[in-house]
Design a protein with these regions (language model features):
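Long hydrophobic alpha-helical segments typical of transmembrane helices together
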Residues: 180, 185-188
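Terminal amphipathic alpha-helical/low-complexity segments used for targeting or macromolecular assembly
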Residues: 1-76, 187-188
Length: 188
């Protein structure tokens, strides 16, 4: 699960893991062409800087990066809270609103398609109500994962699925409400 970024080494490890998920170096040419990868690369770079400064109580820098983060959230139609996402995150497709709310914990190397919503947003949330996502998960278009649930490692959640109960490791789920379609075979 996501750990807090405290040291410069933690920050560098998260930034390297996020950059590695793009599979190539993000260049100035990507910015000129308006490539989605360029926007997401810088969004997550700024999110990691915000997390680092919040966790180390650098007030002025944290305020600056919070403002930058909010501007980018509105521009990309993407809402993520600091300290909720593990290293190696990957979003695809700018446009449809995606969100990872503050009561969620997302593991490492997760992939989200457009319209994914993780966690709950509400005024009367129980502090013990957490949506916990394992490592190496894949979320299809417009899926919702929320409630006091745990999603295991290596899970694939299909398009338009609504997940409201625990999902074991290596599962493929889909439907409304989501049900297990298949358990992936593991190579050992």
């Amino acid at each position: 699960m996501a750990q807090k970024l405290i040291t410069k080494d933690d920050l560098k490890a998260y930034l390297d893991a996020d950059a590695k998920r793009f599979g190539r170096k993000i260049t100035f040419k990507d910015m000129l062409l308006g490539n989605d990868d360029w926007h997401y690369f810088w969004y997550f770079r700024h999110l990691r800087l915000l997390e680092y400064h919040l966790n180390n109580k650098h007030r002025v820098r944290a305020i600056f990066w919070t403002i930058v983060h909010k501007i980018e959230c509105n521009r990309l139609h993407l809402n993520t809270y600091p300290n909720t996402i593990g290293p190696g995150i990957r979003f695809y497709h700018i446009g449809n609103f995606s969100a990872i709310y503050q009561n969620a914990e997302v593991g490492a190397n997760c992939t989200f398609l457009s319209g994914s919503v993780i966690g709950n947003k509400g005024l009367k949330l129980d502090s013990n109500c957490k949506t916990i996502i394992g490592d190496n998960c894949y979320f299809g278009l417009n899926c919702f994962v929320g409630g006091n649930i745990r999603v295991g490692n290596n899970v694939t959640i299909g398009t338009n699925a609504v997940v409201t109960h625990d999902i074991p490791d290596n599962a493929i789920v889909g439907g409304i409400p989501a049900r297990i379609i298949k358990i992936k075979e593991t190579l050992e």
